[in-house]
């Protein structure tokens, strides 16, 4: 009887240990994703400061889609380049800021970032602001934006 109880306790301890290890791996993955997101966000708007679309395009996965308000979904690197040109040339974006409010997920393959954004013109004036959800994807090149959805806080 004591033998069965002892074996049961050992098996339970092993199972709980495995569960804790999985959670630790997931927490490590999430922390790595958060760090990569912060690094990517820190250089995202350099593309507008330098008028360099390659910086912008490199933030996105090859199969990414940008889902801007009141527009059709734009997918792929060519679409990202077109979006950059429109933001720079038509809207006059020259800088901006992301404020991440939360990152959700396990950090294994996908995580979701929630936050706020601000857009500035050549004079450094705020001309638009809003909120966003970005689904990030872990790729061989690192964490990249996979789905980028945002909307303005301004009235249409």
Language-model features: locations:
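Hydrophobic/aromatic beta-strand elements that line small-molecule binding cavities or substrate pockets
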Residues: 84, 98-103, 115-119, 131-137
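Short, low-complexity N-terminal intrinsically disordered segments enriched in polar/charged residues
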Residues: 18-58, 156
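Short beta-strand edge/turn micro-motifs at domain boundaries
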Residues: 129-154
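A short, structured loop/turn motif at beta-sheet edges
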Residues: 103-110, 124, 137-144
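Short, cysteine-centered beta-strand-loop-beta hairpins and adjacent loop/turn segments enriched
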Residues: 91, 119-126
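A solvent-exposed, acidic/Ser-Thr-rich amphipathic alpha-helical stretch
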Residues: 32-36, 53-109
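A mature extracytoplasmic/lumenal domain signature
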Residues: 70, 115-117, 149
């Amino acid at each position: 009887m004591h033998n069965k109880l002892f074996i049961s306790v050992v098996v339970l301890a092993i199972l709980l240990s495995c569960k804790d290890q999985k959670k630790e791996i997931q927490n490590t993955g999430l922390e790595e994703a958060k760090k990569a997101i912060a690094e990517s966000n820190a250089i995202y708007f350099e593309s507008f400061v330098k008028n360099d679309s390659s910086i912008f395009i490199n933030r996105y996965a090859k199969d990414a889609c940008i889902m801007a308000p009141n527009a059709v979904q734009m997918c792929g690197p060519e679409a990202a380049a077109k979006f950059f040109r429109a933001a720079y040339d038509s809207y006059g974006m020259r800088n901006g800021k992301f404020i991440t409010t939360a990152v959700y997920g396990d950090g294994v393959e996908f995580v979701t970032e929630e936050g706020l954004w601000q857009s500035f013109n050549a004079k450094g004036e705020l001309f638009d602001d809003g909120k966003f959800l970005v689904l990030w994807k872990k790729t061989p090149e690192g964490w990249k934006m996979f789905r980028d959805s945002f909307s303005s806080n301004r009235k249409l």
